[in-house]
UniProtKB/Swiss-Prot annotation:
Name under which the protein is recorded: Transposase for insertion sequence element IS231A
Keywords: DNA recombination, DNA-binding, Transposable element, Transposition
Pfam families the UniProt entry points to: DDE_Tnp_1 (PF01609)
GO annotation (BP), single: DNA transposition
Matching Gene3D superfamilies: Transposase Inhibitor Protein From Tn5, Chain A, domain 1
Database matches in NCBIfam families: transpos_IS4_1
Length: 478
């Protein structure tokens, strides 16, 4: 059944309101023990200040926060009284709201149609963002150590590129290991999923598990892993058995690199990775352009000077190539498209950019742990509300107008309307739907993604059919 734009947004409004209405928040606050008796500052007021009206719960003065709360709700609090309400129960309350939102159904109907979706159930993107926090919290949130980071929070996210649905999420210390979380994410794998992983999450065991569970992967290969091919002429013992050390031949990656032109791709179709536990996989080597090489060298120099990490001579020699491993069928993702598909991973960088530049999740003063955590979870809830709204409208714009929405532009515009969303939720779903229709009209007019010359967008790579204005109106599909 094809629903109208208004009907779709009405259903979205009802799902969003389920966990954000004042009555729900009051009941939840009692259930979790944040409120034990009737008082002027309850669950609804905490949500108001941390989610809706303040982006700077961790950096604005308590006097300013009290003023903002009074302006929005009429609740009169002293700075000392407000500070006391930022306690462990408050953190638990906000954490619970965030959990039921991202594990809920908000994004389940936001998947866009694409050629990729006919082959892959979900395109799973995994990455992490990290930011420094007050040094006195180093025992609770030890930092990663880079840039003298003694205390830090790392947020790890895996989401589906088709729908925007959060699949796995973790807030923890900056020193948390990426690879460990990557392994935990395997629990939510489904057959037909495509997992795109960067070097921080590289694990031969994880890639093998994906393959065994009927999922697909595209991953960068760590350069300390050796690539082998089967020896066509192995040595034999007199009894006819193959000598183990002659069974495989090591591939000279540097030799291949030197024979590739910038932008050229080369594939080893039946390769083995690892000295002991060998992973049978496709290996795709992409020769970087001169501009890409210069950017990588600049990044390596920065990493060595700021983080104290020294790159091996082998890594420096192989700066000119990206090495990918994948178990995707060649007929679905030919070698020429592997680099483009891997570049879909950079979409999560856009999401993290909005967290800091628009939602200021990393801004804080020298405050207590509970207030900082209330700020983090309040921002995450606001982020999820805005991003879910963006993914829903992205789908509707594609359905109605065949247009590609700019995620960054759209989230910024939706954030500008957060106060209106808040006011509507206090009333009813019909009023919220009206605000969402206004947002749809705004994003339809001003939210279109800009196209750089000869640069593919996410829709191009995924094979989404859409219209754009280049030299005249055309339809594009990868």
């Amino acid at each position: 059944m094809n629903l109208s734009i208004q009907d779709e947004l009405q259903l979205f409004s009802e799902e969003l309101c389920r966990h954000l209405t004042p009555s729900f928040l009051e009941e939840l606050a009692k259930k979790l023990g944040f409120v034990k008796r009737k008082r002027k500052f309850s669950g609804s007021e905490l949500a108001t200040i941390c989610i809706w009206i303040s982006q700077r719960t961790a950096s604005d003065s308590l006097v300013r926060l009290c003023s903002q709360l009074h302006a929005a709700t009429g609740t009169l609090m002293s700075p000392e009284g407000l500070n006391k309400r930022f306690d462990k129960k408050a953190v638990e309350f906000l954490k619970y709201i965030f959990s039921i939102l991202w594990k809920g159904k908000l994004c389940k109907t936001s998947a866009i149609s694409s050629t990729a979706l006919t082959h892959f159930q979900r395109i799973r993107i995994l990455d992490a963002t990290i930011f420094q926090i007050p040094k006195h919290l180093a025992s609770i949130y030890p930092g990663s150590g880079g840039c003298a980071q003694t205390a830090g929070i790392k947020i790890q996210l895996e989401y589906d590129l088709h729908s925007g649905q959060f699949l796995n999420f973790q807030v923890g210390p900056g020193k948390n290991n990426d690879k460990t979380f990557g392994t935990e994410c395997l629990d939510t794998l489904r057959p037909g999923d495509l997992c795109i992983r960067d070097l921080g999450y590289f694990s031969l065991e994880d890639l093998d598990q994906m393959d065994q569970r009927g999922a697909y992967y595209i991953s960068r290969l760590k350069l300390n892993h050796t690539v082998y091919i089967k020896n066509p002429s192995p040595e034999y013992f007199r009894n006819g058995t193959v000598k183990k050390q002659s069974q495989y031949i090591q591939v000279d990656l540097e030799h291949i690199m030197n024979h590739l032109k910038p932008g050229q791709t080369y594939e080893i179709k039946e390769a083995y990775i690892g000295k002991n536990q060998k992973l049978f996989t496709r290996v795709i080597i992409y020769r970087l352009t001169e501009k890409q090489i210069q950017e990588r060298r600049k990044k390596q120099a920065y990493t060595e000077s700021k983080k104290g990490i020294t790159f091996s001579e082998k890594s420096k020699r192989l700066t000119g190539i990206n090495i990918y491993v994948s178990n995707t069928p060649e007929g679905i993702v030919p070698m020429e498209q592997i680099h483009d598909f891997y570049s879909l991973r950079w979409q999560i960088e856009i999401i993290f950019k909005t967290w800091k530049s628009l939602f200021q999740i990393h801004h804080w003063q020298n405050i207590k742990q509970e207030r900082l955590e209330c700020h983090v979870y309040g921002r995450l809830i606001a982020i999820f509300i805005c991003s879910s709204t963006m993914f829903k409208i992205r789908k509707l714009l594609l359905q109605k107008n065949k247009r590609e929405l700019s995620e960054y532009k759209a989230i910024g515009m939706i954030q500008d309307h957060v106060s209106l969303l808040y006011q509507a939720i206090q009333r009813n779903t019909q009023d919220l739907t009206k605000i969402l229709i206004r947002l749809f009209d705004l994003l339809q007019k001003n939210g279109r993604k800009s196209h750089r010359y000869e640069k593919k967008t996410i829709f191009d790579i995924m094979g989404v059919v859409y219209e754009y204005n280049g030299f005249g109106k055309q339809k594009k599909a990868a």
